[in-house]
Amino acid sequence: MSHGPLRVGIGGPVGAGKTTLTEKLCAALAHRCSMAVITNDIYTREDAEALMRAQVLPAERIRGVETGGCPHTAIREDASINLAAVADLRRTFPDLDLILIESGGDNLAATFSPELADLTIYVIDTAAGQDIPRKRGPGLARSDLLVVNKIDLAPHVGVDLARLEADTQAARGQRPYVMARMRAGVGVEAIVAFLEREGGLQLLPQD
């Protein structure tokens, strides 16, 4: 691509499964394209360290950014710290095809600057409650792809999954969504297909 690697922003509340999604995408794609990850944490680099421990990418392809008290600012109003990390990765790996940018945990209003992310994926947690899709924050309603994660927990937390999906459809309109269980890898293929289709990501054939 003429403007460099596809940059995909991954957002969502704390505990929704952003780091698990990032880990699963790395496991699925690292052998099929040149990729890297930037994680945003408020005061630590815990998410970056978790990915390094999982060994889904070489450590030098993972950057941890400490955002301070307002993680949404670092992905929208002042994305300079993340843009600097993107530039550093591109200098180090000129052949990059894909950069995943994981936001710090935030609320339903968090969105990525178009300057930072070409596509946005927003992750919500089924266990957070039946009414989450009806709240329709910008991340949920306007992200390029919504991932409804942990659907296996629905019966344990009193969530009607069929109603949750109907409310998700109503909130999303024509925009795509995936019902997922990231920890088990359910939904990963659909997300990869989305990146190919909407992001023009070109992948090597699977082994």
Curated annotation (Swiss-Prot):
It comes from the Bacteria. It holds the Pfam family cobW. GO terms for biological process: urea catabolic process. One of its GO terms (cellular component) is cytoplasm. GTP binds at G12, P13, V14, G15, A16, G17, K18, T19. It is found in: Cytoplasm. InterPro entries: CobW/HypB/UreG_nucleotide-bd, P-loop_NTPase, UreG. Keywords: Chaperone, Cytoplasm, GTP-binding, Nickel insertion, Nucleotide-binding. Its main location: cytoplasm. One of its GO terms (molecular function) is GTP binding. Belongs to the SIMIBI class G3E GTPase family. UreG subfamily. Homodimer. UreD, UreF and UreG form a complex that acts as a GTP-hydrolysis-dependent molecular chaperone, activating the urease apoprotein by helping to assemble the nickel containing metallocenter of UreC. The UreE protein probably delivers the nickel. Facilitates the functional incorporation of the urease nickel metallocenter. This process requires GTP hydrolysis, probably effectuated by UreG. This is Urease accessory protein UreG. It comes from Cereibacter sphaeroides (strain ATCC 17023 / DSM 158 / JCM 6121 / CCUG 31486 / LMG 2827 / NBRC 12203 / NCIMB 8253 / ATH 2.4.1.) (Rhodobacter sphaeroides). The lineage of its organism: Bacteria, Pseudomonadati, Pseudomonadota, Alphaproteobacteria, Rhodobacterales.
